[in-house]
Amino acid sequence: MRLPLLLVFASVIPGAVLLLDTRQFLIYNEDHKRCVDAVSPSAVQTAACNQDAESQKFRWVSESQIMSVAFKLCLGVPSKTDWVAITLYACDSKSEFQKWECKNDTLLGIKGEDLFFNYGNRQEKNIMLYKGSGLWSRWKIYGTTDNLCSRGYEAMYTLLGNANGATCAFPFKFENKWYADCTSAGRSDGWLWCGTTTDYDTDKLFGYCPLKFEGSESLWNKDPLTSVSYQINSKSALTWHQARKSCQQQNAELLSITEIHEQTYLTGLTSSLTSGLWIGLNSLSFNSGWQWSDRSPFRYLNWLPGSPSAEPGKSCVSLNPGKNAKWENLECVQKLGYICKKGNTTLNSFVIPSESDVPTHCPSQWWPYAGHCYKIHRDEKKIQRDALTTCRKEGGDLTSIHTIEELDFIISQLGYEPNDELWIGLNDIKIQMYFEWSDGTPVTFTKWLRGEPSHENNRQEDCVVMKGKDGYWADRGCEWPLGYICKMKSRSQGPEIVEVEKGCRKGWKKHHFYCYMIGHTLSTFAEANQTCNNENAYLTTIEDRYEQAFLTSFVGLRPEKYFWTGLSDIQTKGTFQWTIEEEVRFTHWNSDMPGRKPGCVAMRTGIAGGLWDVLKCDEKAKFVCKHWAEGVTHPPKPTTTPEPKCPEDWGASSRTSLCFKLYAKGKHEKKTWFESRDFCRALGGDLASINNKEEQQTIWRLITASGSYHKLFWLGLTYGSPSEGFTWSDGSPVSYENWAYGEPNNYQNVEYCGELKGDPTMSWNDINCEHLNNWICQIQKGQTPKPEPTPAPQDNPPVTEDGWVIYKDYQYYFSKEKETMDNARAFCKRNFGDLVSIQSESEKKFLWKYVNRNDAQSAYFIGLLISLDKKFAWMDGSKVDYVSWATGEPNFANEDENCVTMYSNSGFWNDINCGYPNAFICQRHNSSINATTVMPTMPSVPSGCKEGWNFYSNKCFKIFGFMEEERKNWQEARKACIGFGGNLVSIQNEKEQAFLTYHMKDSTFSAWTGLNDVNSEHTFLWTDGRGVHYTNWGKGYPGGRRSSLSYEDADCVVIIGGASNEAGKWMDDTCDSKRGYICQTRSDPSLTNPPATIQTDGFVKYGKSSYSLMRQKFQWHEAETYCKLHNSLIASILDPYSNAFAWLQMETSNERVWIALNSNLTDNQYTWTDKWRVRYTNWAADEPKLKSACVYLDLDGYWKTAHCNESFYFLCKRSDEIPATEPPQLPGRCPESDHTAWIPFHGHCYYIESSYTRNWGQASLECLRMGSSLVSIESAAESSFLSYRVEPLKSKTNFWIGLFRNVEGTWLWINNSPVSFVNWNTGDPSGERNDCVALHASSGFWSNIHCSSYKGYICKRPKIIDAKPTHELLTTKADTRKMDPSKPSSNVAGVVIIVILLILTGAGLAAYFFYKKRRVHLPQEGAFENTLYFNSQSSPGTSDMKDLVGNIEQNEHSVI
């Protein structure tokens, strides 16, 4: 169900208008007359209802969370179990224990469970979660009959700020205070803002609210010629539907362009931008052509060459400033900026008549309507020019059509026929792609056919026809001989003579066999019906499209909004009936109608003229009465004939005229909605339409007879247009509904077809039309069905010899086995492919439909990766310019869902931990190497680690926690590791475990690993997404050896440390415990590893001892003697650390090794021959086997016994130690200047400009103007931070950075930082003249390009060190400027400006590099510590639409 946004507030907010907040409600139990009362966060009870009590007010703050207005906390439970208390918790959108849903009109329950919101069953004071659904579990909104979900949440999209248009997160925390509404707190200019994450204090992400407040008009640009206002949201990144909603939240719409002047103005307004911006043009309607979302006429075309593309799914249009502001159609799910519009661009004073019954007198054979006369010339076929000449000779012109009412008049009263194709006056002969009426009147209305206007095949289709049953329009070549419609003004100048039409009384209007009268008194539905009855008439019925067209033309031009018809469902909810005993044969619902609430039906006027809405029956409106005209012969009653029969295997009821048949098929034979409809039509029928309960019961009997319980079947329901509701494919009226609760909801804006669930409820659901389902056909009784059509061969695409499916230029492999992502990708690579990258809607549909038809697993890995900084990348390097996320995804659950799967039931995508086994899809090009060829082995590349990190198996590891202050909880530890460019350790095998144990020798703590079961209890996964192929649980773990800790709370895993014989083993622990932790990163090919410290005599230090592996085979006693000769002893292994070290020493020898344990010398008791007590052992299974023997360390790391006269390598032992440190964080704050948003990270502040592109020199100058320089990137952490910040802007631009090449060919940073880190794209740097460097927003990699290119840019400056408290800094901007030390000194800044001016004036980089060598340093800029305080004297306009709030602090732990 779609819910309107109610952006109004209950209290005065500075700068806002005082309005009642209708989002708030009281939760009311009608049976017991009590309301829910939040007494405290731990006590949610009931009390006598009091609308003024804050403690009783609640509000939806997400699709599934309910917040207490008093406490700014959300209703939740500790677990999903029966009879637990419902209390208040800090709102967490990811918590399953805070997600609520309406189960029906009264039941509220925890999502996904039959556990309900309950009070009073067992005399508890608190509200409880309870399995019962009795009277105490039934709730409404106080003062209404509405259910709790009727005041549902709708996202509020932000403007400007630094969150790319993200939605407000309510409640959000600012300066340790929670806000449930937009606020001006922290701002002196009164601008209303919100946080876009729940914790602004940490994340520093925000935007301005789409509300009216003082200064908000400065967000708009007003065209001085037309007074129309435009808002350019270039910094946002939203889908088309999100962008439209954002405009609507400001009482505006996505841009429509109807005049050449308007396009010219907008071209200039967006000239400095380079990325596409959504506009309102779309082809989302199934039944009509290109249209503007604000219903403006589509009369001006400005397509980019090659557009509009006919590719399926590209239904929304963007204006591309980088391509001369031309238009191109794209998939609506792409994320772009957008343009909103307020006002009307029409410059003409033309007035559409406000009534249809103005005085009109016409010549013979002409028909009057609203002051004009009309005539169809159907039989005189003429080319457009000759038709125009004929109309003008008759005193008129080819018809112009200015409203839906006028179009409906032509269809219903002028004798128009469905097979007509008639010239109208619209054409673009005078100005190509700019349609005008030949009579000179302005174009105020268009109604194009699907795919029109087309200018097909670049032909000159300059003239327009109307055709088809609905009279919609298409452009055609003007030389076709066709019929035509003429129109002229009424010739009468005198007062109207009211004519009484034959068969009707005075004041009534005749149409065909009926008389109609407009009731001029505002009345309720019952009053209107009684008034009509008093006139021996009844509230109007509407029998078909043509009567609807007549009534639209009859009342549509009137100023009143609604006119009652005789339709309602007040007798039986969901079944609409006329007030007279007449069958409902036609419906014409408005969008989202008829909905779930019972009511009475009224017909709209105005821009939605003729569409039907369901209103409360006690509302007052005017109405239309109807009766049979006098003298009209009523149609004879049908003669009684034997009822026709249905075919043998079809079902019917005696009260319906239809026969139905189920087609319940196997997975391979199911069909899409369109395929099912075509199948039924090939039989001579259609998909089933259900018009009453009798027909529904007939279908239920067929389901029970065939045993098709719980199967899903297509019905003929389809959503024809965004401006209309559901219709039946056979054209029958939607007079009966049986939607499931909460349906139709148009999930993800792709659910346009209806299905029926084969259970006793027989409920309906809207779903994607491309889904594969069973289906139900219908035919008329007495009709013999035609033979069933032969299945199309395209359902079985060709397959290669090795089992890959061929589709277009690629081959695909669909696995039946489940693997981790690493294993899945390895399989694809071995077969010369990779995990699939999906580049378009059509490719996704192919994959989705294939897995649906072929025994699909529930989900399949695809090749999309999500990095730790939430950037997206295809594994094969393809650009990410198409995504198809499921609702609420990606949700980055537990921050470790870095892989992506495609759901087989919908085709939408979900982020998931890479280590969770799934099926997968591989992809390779048709030209790839034959699969029988051996895949070449890539040579290993030498690599190393940073200082302080330990290298092993091409990875780097570091253990933290040796100092108490280093220890963290699991989440903090993971953030710290991510900040190093890695993650918490994932241990893949015994050798890696031994390496880590070896390095924990001096620990006194246990250390976090990446293993956890946070997302799914008892399913342990590595947080970096690697598969769980090895475990090393300690005794009793996981889930054992708890004291007061509950099993459910122990979700994270540590390696046991300290002086324990189980050191190195794993145990699960509570994630918020403070522990050490182990970070892991990839090794760096640019680094080398220092050799192990080996003493001159071949011994290696470890702990307080030194060891030497003797690589010669001796018997045990010979080995002991040899060690003594070398001033050592045969090695004892006293703890798990030494065991790990010793085993690692054997790694390259592949030989067994004697150790000092022996029972041969000590009366069959195993002891260490160096006299250490045996406190630790690591026996293999079934060991020790021998009573009197010597012990060796085997290749698997375990101890085994052997006769002492066998010969093995041996380990000698003698006796030292090593420390570790961690770098400190840097303090400071960022400046505020002219609404420029600086983003802090470590010791610097960054400004990202994506809307105004510059060449490299201009960008340098812009940064200098702000007291900064083009960014220097000096570490992987800094690179990751910037990549994360610019990735949402990838649809807009790439960004200049401060790296350049001087005349000597040396790469230098503009601020003289050393070039110690680079992140070149593959194949870069390249080109002799490409001397400046840009960062790719989509990948974070760098490319060197020509300095004259226009890009966005990133500025960087040091943080300001200022010890003043925040409250002392809340001064005016004037005060700020007085103390602002950021202005560059004239001598320093002058040099830099001269350098850049040389570049700008063509003196070239050579001169610039000359000045560069003089090492100009930029001074710091002063500003406020709390950068939400701006204190500007004027608000920014579109000409300066830079991000308006600074200090958006990236979480330090996430990137360091």
UniProtKB/Swiss-Prot annotation:
GO terms for biological process: cellular response to interleukin-4; cellular response to lipopolysaccharide; cellular response to type II interferon; receptor-mediated endocytosis. Glycans are attached at N104, N344, N529, N926, N930, N1160, N1205. The keyword Protein transport does not apply. Disulfide bonds join C35-C49, C74-C91, C168-C194, C182-C209, C247-C340, C316-C332, C391-C486, C463-C478, C532-C625, C600-C617, C646-C659, C680-C777, C753-C769, C828-C922, C899-C914, C977-C1079, C1052-C1071, C1123-C1212, C1190-C1204, C1263-C1355, C1332-C1347. Residues 163-211 form the Fibronectin type-II domain. GO terms for cellular component: cell surface; endosome membrane; plasma membrane. SUPFAM superfamilies: C-type lectin-like (SSF56436), Kringle-like (SSF57440), Ricin B-like lectins (SSF50370). Residues 1411-1456 are cytoplasmic. GO terms for molecular function: cargo receptor activity; D-mannose binding; signaling receptor activity; transmembrane signaling receptor activity; virus receptor activity. It is a single-pass type I membrane protein. Residues 1-18 form the signal peptide. Residues 22-142 form the Ricin B-type lectin domain. InterPro entries: C-type_lectin-like (IPR001304), C-type_lectin-like/link_sf (IPR016186), C-type_lectin/snaclec_domain (IPR050111), C-type_lectin_CS (IPR018378), CTDL_fold (IPR016187), FN_type2_dom (IPR000562), FN_type2_sf (IPR036943), Kringle-like (IPR013806). The C-type lectin domains, also called carbohydrate-recognition domains or CRDs, 1-3 have at most very weak affinity for carbohydrates. C-type lectin domain 4 shows the highest affinity binding and has multispecificity for a variety of monosaccharides. At least 3 C-type lectin domains (4, 5, and 7) are required for high affinity binding and endocytosis of multivalent glycoconjugates. Mediates the endocytosis of glycoproteins by macrophages. Binds both sulfated and non-sulfated polysaccharide chains. (Microbial infection) Acts as a phagocytic receptor for bacteria, fungi and other pathogens. This is Macrophage mannose receptor 1.
